[in-house]
């Protein structure tokens, strides 16, 4: 069984079943922490105001239930250790490919590099089967 903190497990429980499957498999192979899954209106607008997101509420894959995006980091977390983020991303992408889970990593984005961010692709298609998060 994967080792995840209770907080990471709770966040993962709010994610789309494909993301849960993927990151449970990843947790069997690497130490990870799930920082965020669902993000309500106030949290999304705060992230936008702080420059941590370019999306207003309803325009982010985090704003849906089940969550269509997760923020996942290598554990223990060291924001300055970018090679560990890249190594985790390689593992996540390999697992996603193996499982045929369509995925985008925020570290591959041209403008705002979002190293912890993983989302189902295309997330707006998955949003058609979800609902906006309350709050």
Range-by-range predicted roles:
Residues 1-33:
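Active-site acidic/histidine clusters and adjacent loop/turn architecture
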Residues 3-7, 53, 73:
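Generic alpha-helix detector with strongest preference for long hydrophobic helices that associate
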Residues 8-12, 43-51, 93:
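Short linear motifs at secondary-structure transitions and domain/linker junctions
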Residues 15-17, 51-55, 100:
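Short amphipathic alpha-helical surface micro-motifs
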Residues 17, 21, 42, 87:
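Short, well-structured alpha-helical interface segments that form or flank functional binding sites
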Residues 23-52, 98, 104-106:
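Extended, low-complexity, intrinsically disordered C-terminal regulatory tails
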Residues 55-135:
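Catalytic cores and adjacent binding grooves of peptidoglycan-active enzymes
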């Amino acid at each position: 069984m994967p080792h995840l903190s209770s907080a990471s497990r709770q966040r993962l429980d709010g994610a789309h079943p494909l993301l849960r499957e993927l990151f449970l498999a990843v947790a069997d192979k690497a130490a990870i922490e799930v920082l965020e899954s669902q993000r309500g209106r106030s949290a999304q607008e705060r992230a936008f105001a702080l420059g941590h997101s370019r999306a207003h509420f309803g325009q982010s894959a985090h704003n849906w239930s089940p969550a269509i995006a997760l923020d996942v980091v290598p554990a223990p977390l060291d924001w300055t250790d970018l090679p560990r983020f890249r190594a985790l991303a390689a593992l996540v992408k390999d697992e996603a490919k193996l499982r045929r889970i369509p995925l985008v990593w925020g570290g591959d984005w041209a403008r705002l590099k979002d190293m912890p961010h993983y989302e189902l692709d295309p997330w707006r298609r998955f949003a058609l089967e979800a609902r906006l998060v309350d709050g």
